[in-house]
Amino acid sequence: MTTPYKHEPFTNFQDQNNVEAFKKALATVSEYLGKDYPLVINGERVETEAKIVSINPADKEEVVGRVSKASQEHAEQAIQAAAKAFEEWRYTSPEERAAVLFRAAAKVRRRKHEFSALLVKEAGKPWNEADADTAEAIDFMEYYARQMIELAKGKPVNSREGEKNQYVYTPTGVTVVIPPWNFLFAIMAGTTVAPIVTGNTVVLKPASATPVIAAKFVEVLEESGLPKGVVNFVPGSGAEVGDYLVDHPKTSLITFTGSREVGTRIFERAAKVQPGQQHLKRVIAEMGGKDTVVVDEDADIELAAQSIFTSAFGFAGQKCSAGSRAVVHEKVYDQVLERVIEITESKVTAKPDSADVYMGPVIDQGSYDKIMSYIEIGKQEGRLVSGGTGDDSKGYFIKPTIFADLDPKARLMQEEIFGPVVAFCKVSDFDEALEVANNTEYGLTGAVITNNRKHIERAKQEFHVGNLYFNRNCTGAIVGYHPFGGFKMSGTDSKAGGPDYLALHMQAKTISEMF
């Protein structure tokens, strides 16, 4: 009998005891920086000459780890190992599979600060963001374990006299997991354990920018009793290894989180039936957003400003849920803009060595260059009112940047930047606000700051996003509380951390017995 699910509490860094504990965790992680990590194929460690070098984006001189780089030959071995392991793992009871997740969650919880400290080093996350990332990883394991125990019963269907009908779920097969670097622990862990607990086997190709946390998590799964071959760890390039895994005829399911460009490419490649393939592949994809915070004319100014700031600049705007657009009613536009500038300029952007750092670096040189190029575009399209500068001499640091007076069709209002840049757009009424909010190809998250009940009810119907929030920021979805996934080009609306998610990894089977 399991206890009811509750999300993992966040660490209070106002408590000096927690600060000291986290400093110790950072020291612990520092002791194993630069370590080599092998591939894991069928439970065996495989060292390769080629390496993926993970560096600290806040300190380019600091190597977090060197991870063996897989070739197509390794990818083939991993697929075969997963296919072989599937024949036994699929028949392991759901309760036993769930028990692996419960044990893994407990192990991560006991080392929570250590894992969070690794996220600070590998992704440049501020302490509170790293802590939330680790908490979410724990949540995915706890939530999906409980969900699988419930789904093991199947769903009720009708039976006529003289027959017994059942509707049950069965595993799908080999799952290729391609997670992102931004939620390097939470999404990587969640998309790995969901197929595992549903009876599938996994080939995990982690993000090349952040492979060390994935290697550490695979160790946790093995220590938690996961049999060999159920998870296989093959870091490698998307072009060489990623495409090979997606195209493979033994791949049944692909779960991907990342850019629209890569996601649509995977969707297209997965649709092609390869020689020897005996099934249609499924794709679970989350592909980003261009998310909007709408501020109504009667909004609380402080709440609106805090919501915009948090949505835009948490983890340097490197979230698919980031509120990179502020659509504000003309009556309160100047007040809200001024207050967001004040809040932003009061915060610390630096190497995340202490709890008071609000924003750290962006992930790498490519991201830095892309974001800085968008800032130049913004200078042509709007009015730069804060930030706009960067420094990549020691790490990849960009000041939180605010542009005002953007046209709704401007590039800064339409294209995903994935950095600390927010664009303000003035509207004359709520009709126009909703029109602008819906005018992109994405539909992931959104927020409305208002005290108008009619406008709230209308936005529920007409603001077309997968995750809609009122009178709060549009980031920070919690597993089991705010199932996460978007519409349109934001993905397949596969709600991670929700009651429907595990079923996407399984096949429904109808069984009818006469007696």
From Swiss-Prot:
Disruption outcome: Deletion of the putBCP operon abolishes L-proline utilization.
One CC-aspect GO term: cytoplasmic side of plasma membrane
Membrane-spanning parts: none
CDD domains recorded: ALDH_PutA-P5CDH-RocA
Coiled-coil parts of chain: none
Induction data: The expression of the putBCP operon is induced in a PutR-dependent fashion by very low concentrations of L-proline in the growth medium. CodY represses the operon by displacing PutR from DNA.
Domain of life of the native organism: Bacteria
Swiss-Prot/TrEMBL GO biological process terms: glutamate biosynthetic process; proline catabolic process to glutamate
Reactions mediated catalytically: L-glutamate 5-semialdehyde + NAD(+) + H2O = L-glutamate + NADH + 2 H(+)
Top EC class, one word: oxidoreductase
Keyword Oxidoreductase in annotation: yes
Pathway: Amino-acid degradation; L-proline degradation into L-glutamate; L-glutamate from L-proline: step 2/2
Active site: E286, C320
SUPFAM superfamilies: ALDH-like
Keywords carried by this UniProt record: NAD, Oxidoreductase
Record-listed E.C. numbers: 1.2.1.88
One Pfam family per UniProt: Aldedh
GO molecular function, one term: proline dehydrogenase activity
InterPro entries according to UniProt: Ald_DH/histidinol_DH (IPR016161), Ald_DH_C (IPR016163), Ald_DH_CS_CYS (IPR016160), Ald_DH_CS_GLU (IPR029510), Ald_DH_N (IPR016162), Aldehyde_DH_dom (IPR015590), Proline_metab_enzyme (IPR050485), RocA (IPR005932)
UniProt keyword DNA repair, yes or no: no
Function: Important for the use of proline as a sole carbon and energy source or a sole nitrogen source.
Family of the protein in this entry: Belongs to the aldehyde dehydrogenase family. RocA subfamily.
Protein name as it appears in the record: 1-pyrroline-5-carboxylate dehydrogenase 2
Native source species: Bacillus subtilis (strain 168)
Gene that encodes the chain: putC
